[in-house]
Amino acid sequence: YPESQIDVVGGPHAGVSAFQEVRGYVDAHTHGMAFEFLGGEAHCGKPWDRYGAPYALVDCEDHTLTGGYGAALETFLSGEPGHDPVGWPTFKDWPAPHSLTHEGTYYRWMERAWRGGQRLFVNLLVENNKLCEIYPLKRNSCDDMDSIRLQARQMHKFQDYIDAQFGGPGKGFYRIVTNPFQARQVINAGKMAVIMGIETSVPFGCTF
């Protein structure tokens, strides 16, 4: 299938032992599974698709139907009245720092960052049930913890997908870790340690 290129050569750096100091840079705040939040219809595109970039890097249906105009959430967040609804392969208007409703963490782009030295990635599972209830389009539950658990499952599916691209279980660069020792091992193996976090106003269903 057609795929985004990374245009990077050479092997990623690693440690000489599993226990030494680690080197690399950190992305400490990302919402990599945001395609499932706010009911699952507010974010356009996703980090991967079994059929590659042409299916993962697409605009939301409501944006496409109006030619990129009338996308209220995108317009409010970006300050732009409209945008080119075509993602792959032209990417005229997105991804972009001001375009918060469009995918920016496609797996090949993350691979480029990893090959360029990123070694720690903090992925925050995110939800806001009140905004979800207000947004008119949805396919998922607005309950914070339902959404958080769904995004956590998607993180593991994402890891499995990257593993498959690199030859099998455990071979991919994206490795979910649960403690500092695991993170050190992963980074010194030349891979990227991924920390799962939560950003929600209603953790564990306390007030919803």
Residue ranges and their predicted role:
Residues 1-208:
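N-terminal hydrophobic targeting/anchoring segments and the immediately downstream early-domain regions
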